Curated annotation (Swiss-Prot):
Binding site for Fe cation: 190, 192, 278
UniProt catalytic activity: N(6),N(6),N(6)-trimethyl-L-lysyl(9)-[histone H3] + 2 2-oxoglutarate + 2 O2 = N(6)-methyl-L-lysyl(9)-[histone H3] + 2 formaldehyde + 2 succinate + 2 CO2
Source organism: Mus musculus
Domain JmjN per the UniProt entry, residue ranges: 16-58
Ranges for domain Tudor: 875-932, 933-989
Name under which the protein is recorded: Lysine-specific demethylase 4C
Ranges annotated as biased composition (Basic residues): 361-370
Family listed: Belongs to the JHDM3 histone demethylase family.
Pfam families per the UniProt record, alphabetical: JmjC, JmjN, PHD_2, Tudor_2, zf-HC5HC2H_2
Functional description taken from the UniProt entry: Histone demethylase that specifically demethylates 'Lys-9' and 'Lys-36' residues of histone H3, thereby playing a central role in histone code. Does not demethylate histone H3 'Lys-4', H3 'Lys-27' nor H4 'Lys-20'. Demethylates trimethylated H3 'Lys-9' and H3 'Lys-36' residue, while it has no activity on mono- and dimethylated residues. Demethylation of Lys residue generates formaldehyde and succinate.
Record keywords: Chromatin regulator, Dioxygenase, Iron, Metal-binding, Nucleus, Oxidoreductase, Repeat, Transcription, Transcription regulation, Zinc, Zinc-finger
């Protein structure tokens, strides 16, 4: 067997290996894979296999132009300095022909380049420009019938146990996926679902570049990503499984993370190994096919794979059947949680084991005639249409797992003969219009219900939804000749019975337009409370409608005994953030948060604000008072988080608490005793101290942290400021009993921060020999630490003049002069500005943010707005109460609550991984929930779906939804949710105030007022404008007038 590029049989350098098997060696996939690992190929996490020249998976690719790409995605990328976040936005369906034309157009085509290195540089340089379209996650195969060698649709590996024993088919995991790429389409850093193997074959087109990190160094990449993206990390431990994070090779190289790269040409295979992180991009238009597979070596990886916990539809495979079947000697101790096993990433997989041989022999005996996997299989049953609103914004929340993938409404056909993607027949528009559907109605009526799902006897269709998902069931008889149809997938029906689905027109998603990263000045008049600032994509970028040649339906056929089907989302959908760029300075003209006029502190007026009372002697406008600084530092050292730098993310003052509670918290801290030598975990991420990737003096992250992630709390012997050694940049050998902070070492008793108006706290010297708070240097965007590990040489020279002119809403009336540099609220275009220490003292919420932002700041107004919905829902509304809500004319009016209804819904997780949180209790057929109440949490149940079939599920919980029937003054009624209703004592949002009117149209005046009042105060009759005399007017009186006039004219003519 020929092996090139790497000579060492064990591959100690973990380099990507390339293999060139002979035709004889190529015939047995599992045997050759074991050979590859015996040479150490798995240590790189990625390997290339160049098949024999005589092997062809498909003879011709000219006949796939009409293959439908049901849900293309547009990949928007944000970020800088080698650290990026990718968001996938679903677009309208198109054919391969249309996609190829788009990929080769001047807007999306590959730029000119000298070599692959030059193209790679252009990729990382232009990553954030011109969002490309990716035809990803298309369930199906384009292998020719009869190709047995390395057939991605049937590799015959131990992963087949999932479908054979459990009857579950996971699209893209144990079925093949097709990918149509164009220049710059990307797959972000990730390992495979459940840390499985994967295989990728590039059928034709331009090359594909790959990056790979050896499995033995995967944890290092995770730690680096957690540091750069702390917000994502806090939301989900396995956030890299979201497939949204891009880290450039230059960043990996800088932080010492081993990686290798390779280019895959057309006609070559790439194999990824368990826990091998990989990423890459396409050089231009191409077509690839891939799937997952497994060996016995993978089982130990699957047992410890870290799974995404924030999304309900991420792939999760029960390891029970694998351990029981292939590791029987360890099954019992594994079930007891005592199977302690450390994975050896260097160990190759065995060619076979007695358990595998037994399984293969049994499989051969039970093997049925091969069934084609070509074409699309139907998806799993999806949540009800009522959940559609949650998908509209491509949100990342996971009630019913919104926005994590394009929810296709699948339709499967069965032609007269077995039809494959490779043998698609073109049909004209006329033929499509003449197509008739004839379905034996008895098949629909006589289908027996069962918990495992029923055999399909209906024709189903597939819709790539845009902003949301919607469906309506119709009978075959409702299909009209010439009705708009969409192409059917080609292959067999798998799983549950589908229905004919009515196609609903959905709007294209709106994409927030990015703000220019310049020092743009915004006045408050320009502020927009809405989080998203969107505009439609350029017209013509994606074909607006399906072409006529894609219309038509074929007669279905019953396929028996098919497994349930779920789906793996390789490129989940996401929503780009709508927020201001890091360097944007928004000038404040007049803020709603401005404090009432207060005389200057210098005039010795008693402070009334609770948050400002402890600071009375710390304002820089007062004479230096080192004893006051000592007292303040010593007091706050006893308050969580016990570090003067970590406190940036955990302020001492709690604005939501009462005045008495805040005063009590401060008094308690004064009387506490400081514990010395304690180690705690810093809550401020290390990456908050990094300004950009160009910090060349920066050593590996967390240089001064202990191995367990903790750091020693140390206190200055003179000023009593308390900090983590790692946060303040103190090496372990400098920590001693009489440790002094930087300002006390220099006896700088009058030192004060040049970035704010307060004294005290942890200070470091700047490059121009001034002083600055470490927390100010962290939070002000343009300030950087030249020496990051030691937090020294603070550079403040890059602060723009616009920022220096901003006025702090907290101290502008407490001091006589404007000084320091303010930060601003991160919400949209909010111009609220404040000093870092003032905002911290007042309790403004600051949180670590993902790169390239450092902290996310939320002012009080937007903190209230973000919680308004939940707080509003806490207030009860009764029948007869006067409230404010939106009328059908889109304006807001006062109205009266006339009825309140409630409905209890159950939250269930179906066997195929789909999720519903609005299941009616009466739909649970395995238990009489109306009489007995809900089942126990986690109990297995049977759910009757609207399609009339039964599905297995697990009960997760319940929720209650309330609807309020309101009546307006004009007599019209409407049912509203609680979050859409405002009581008279609630503060109305600005957008509601702008559209609030005192009375609706008095169409039914006598309902509310007497005839005498109406006669005297009736509105004047509206007259139709002469400009609109030729326009259609939706007015019954006017239409009656026109009709009578027309009839009179006709009578005269007669």
């Amino acid at each position: 067997m020929e092996v090139v590029e790497v000579e060492s049989p064990l591959n100690p350098s973990c380099k990507i290996m390339t293999f060139r098997p002979s035709m004889e060696e190529f015939r047995e996939f599992n045997k050759y894979l074991a050979y590859m690992e015996s040479k150490g190929a798995h240590r790189a996490g990625l390997a290339k296999v160049i098949p024999p020249k005589e092997w062809k998976p498909r003879q011709c690719y000219d006949d796939i132009d009409n293959l439908l790409i049901p849900a293309p995605i547009q990949q928007m990328v944000t970020g800088q300095s080698g650290l990026f976040t990718q968001y996938n936005i679903q677009k309208k369906a198109m054919t391969v022909k249309e996609f190829r034309q788009l990929a080769n157009s001047s807007k999306y085509c590959t730029p000119r380049y000298l070599d692959y290195e030059d193209l790679e540089r252009k990729y990382w340089k232009n990553l954030t420009f011109v969002a490309p379209i990716y035809g990803a996650d298309i369930n199906g195969s384009i292998y020719d019938e009869g190709v047995d060698e390395w057939n991605i649709a049937r590799l015959n590996t131990v992963l087949d146990v999932v479908e054979e024993e459990c009857g579950i088919s996971i699209e893209g995991v144990n079925t093949p996926y097709l990918y149509f790429g164009m220049w710059k389409t990307t797959f972000a850093w990730h390992t495979e679902d459940m840390d499985l193997y994967s295989i990728n074959y590039l059928h034709f087109g331009e090359p594909k570049s790959w990056y790979a990190i050896p499995p033995e160094h995967g944890k290092r990449l995770e730690r680096l990503a957690q540091g750069f993206f702390p917000s994502s990390s806090q939301g989900c431990d396995a956030f890299l499984r979201h497939k949204m994070t891009l880290i450039s090779p230059s960043v990996l190289k800088k932080y010492g993370i081993p990686f290798d790269k390779i280019t895959q040409e057309a006609g070559e295979f790439m194999i990824t190994f368990p826990y091998g992180y990989h990423a890459g991009f396409n050089h231009g238009f191409n077509c690839a096919e891939s799937t997952n597979f497994a060996t016995v070596r993978w089982i130990d990886y699957g047992k410890v794979a870290k799974l995404c916990t924030c999304r309900n539809d991420m792939v999760k495979i029960s390891m029970d059947i694998f351990v029981k079947k292939f590791q029987p000697d360890r099954y019992q101790i594994w079930k007891q949680g005592k199977d302690i096993y450390t994975i050896d990433h260097t160990k190759p997989t065995p060619e076979s084991t007695p358990e595998v041989k037994t399984w293969l022999q049994r499989k051969k005996k039970l093997r049925k005639p091969p069934k084609s996997l070509q074409g699309n299989k139907p998806l799993c049953k999806r949540p009800k249409p009522e959940e559609d609103e949650e998908f509209a914004e491509f949100s990342g929340e996971e009630g019913a797992n919104p926005a994590m993938g394009p929810r296709h409404l699948k339709v499967t056909e069965k032609p007269e003969k077995a039809l494959k993607l490779g043998k698609l027949e073109e049909s004209s528009a006329k033929e499509a219009l003449d197509t008739r559907i004839q379905v034996d109605q008895s098949l629909l009526n006589d289908t027996k219900l069962s918990g495992k799902g029923c055999i399909s006897s209906s024709v189903t269709a597939e819709i790539p939804p845009e902003d949301n998902r919607a469906s309506a069931v119709i009978s075959p008889s409702q299909l009209k000749e010439g009705a708009d149809c969409i192409p059917l997938s080609h292959g067999h029906q798998a799983g549950k019975e589908s229905h004919l689905l009515k196609i609903l027109k959905l709007e294209s998603p709106k994409i927030p337009s990015p703000l220019p990263e310049s020092n743009k000045v915004l006045t408050e008049g320009e502020e927009n409370d809405e989080e998203g600032h969107g505009s439609n994509l350029e017209p013509g970028e994606i074909p607006e409608a399906l072409s006529e040649e894609r219309n038509g339906l074929n007669i279905p056929k019953i396929i028996e005994g098919q497994p349930k089907t779920t789906k793996s989302w390789r490129h989940p959908l996401g929503k780009p953030p709508a927020r201001s760029p890091m360097t944007l300075v928004k000038q404040q003209v007049a803020s709603d948060e401005e404090l009432p006029e207060v005389l200057s502190i210098d005039e010795e007026v008693e402070e009334t604000e609770s948050w400002a009372k402890p600071l009375i002697h710390l304002w820089q406008t007062k004479s230096p008072n080192f004893m006051a600084e000592q007292e303040y530092n010593a007091t706050v050292a006893k308050m969580e988080p016990n570090c003067a730098i970590c406190t940036l993310l955990m302020p001492y003052y709690k604005p939501d608490s009462s005045k008495e509670e805040n005063d009590s918290r401060w008094e308690t801290a004064v009387n506490e005793v400081v514990q010395s030598g304690r180690k705690t975990k810093p809550i401020i991420p290390e990456m908050c101290f990094i300004y950009s990737e160009e910090n060349v003096d920066y050593s590996p992250p967390n240089a001064f942290l202990e191995e367990d992630g903790t750091s020693l709390l140390i206190s200055c012997a003179k000023c009593f400021v308390r900090v983590h050694a790692s946060c303040y940049g103190v090496p372990s050998h400098e920590v001693c009993d009489g440790w002094l902070c930087a300002r006390c070492k220099r006896n700088a008793w009058t030192a004060e921060c040049c970035l704010c108006n307060l004294r005290g706290g942890a200070l470091k010297q700047t490059k121009n020999n001034q002083w600055a708070h470490v927390i100010c240097a962290v939070a002000v965007p343009e300030v950087r630490f030249t020496n990051v590990p030691e937090r020294t040489q603070i550079d403040v020279d890059r602060i723009p003049l616009q920022r220096l002119k901003l006025k702090c809403i907290f101290c502008r009336h407490r001091v006589k002069k404007v000084s320091g540099a303010c930060i601003q609220c991160s919400y949209g275009r909010c111009p609220a500005s404040f000093h870092v220490t003032c905002a911290h003292a007042a309790g403004v919420l600051m949180e670590p943010d993902d790169w390239p932002y450092v902290v996310n700041i939320t002012c009080f107004r937007h903190r209230v707005n973000s919680n308004a919905k939940s707080k509003t829902c806490e207030k009860a509304i009764s029948v007869g109460q006067t409230v404010i809500t939106k009328h059908r004319n889109t304006r807001y009016y006062s109205c009266r609550v006339i009825d309140v209804t409630s409905q209890t819904f159950y939250e269930v997780m179906f066997d195929d991984g789909s999720f519903s949180r609005d299941t009616f209790p009466e739909d649970i057929v395995s238990r009489n929930c109306v009489k007995l109440g809900p089942p126990a949490e986690g109990e297995v149940i049977q759910v009757k779906w609207p399609d009339g079939k039964l599905y297995g599920a697990k009960y997760l919980g319940s929720n209650v939804a309330y609807m309020y029937q309101v009546e307006f003054e004009d007599g019209s009624q409407i049912a509203m949710k609680r979050e859409d209703i405002y009581t008279l004592d609630e503060e109305l949002p600005k957008r509601v105030k702008a559209r609030f009117s005192t009375a609706s149209d008095m169409r039914f005046e006598d309902t509310f007022y007497g005839a005498d009042v109406i006669q005297g105060e009736r509105k004047r009759q509206r007259v139709l404008s002469s400009r609109l005399k030729n326009e259609y007017v939706d007015d019954p009186v006017y239409r009656t007038f026109l009709k009578s006039s027309f009839q009179k004219k006709c009578q005269k003519r007669q």
